[in-house]
Regions:
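Enriched for short, Lys/Arg-rich terminal
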Residues: 1-6, 10-13, 17, 21-24, ...
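A short, surface-exposed loop/turn module that caps and links secondary-structure elements
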Residues: 29-54
């Protein structure tokens, strides 16, 4: 059974602003991570509650993993903007 994915409004807008082929690549990579756990994921330091980032080429998806049953996507940004 897969995880429930919750997108905040800002993350939805950021994904819509990205060109379609890149946005689809991001969605496929996110789906693969949610199904298999595969992907370049790291916990971000000094952030509470714990937040993670999934690296997909030049883009970063920031999210909270809620005890394994749901994931809240908080941002989808180009790497030059992701850590500001």
């Amino acid at each position: 059974m897969g995880k429930n994915v919750i997108w905040n409004d800002q993350a939805k807008a950021q994904l819509r602003a990205i060109d379609q082929p890149t946005a689809l690549r991001i969605l496929h990579a996110l789906a693969r991570y949610l199904e298999t756990g595969e992907g370049d994921v790291k916990r971000l330091q000094n952030i509470e509650p714990p937040e993670f980032r999934l690296r997909i080429g030049d883009y970063r998806v920031r999210f909270h993993d809620h005890h394994g049953d749901s994931v809240r996507i908080t941002a989808v940004k180009h790497r030059r903007e992701a850590y500001r």
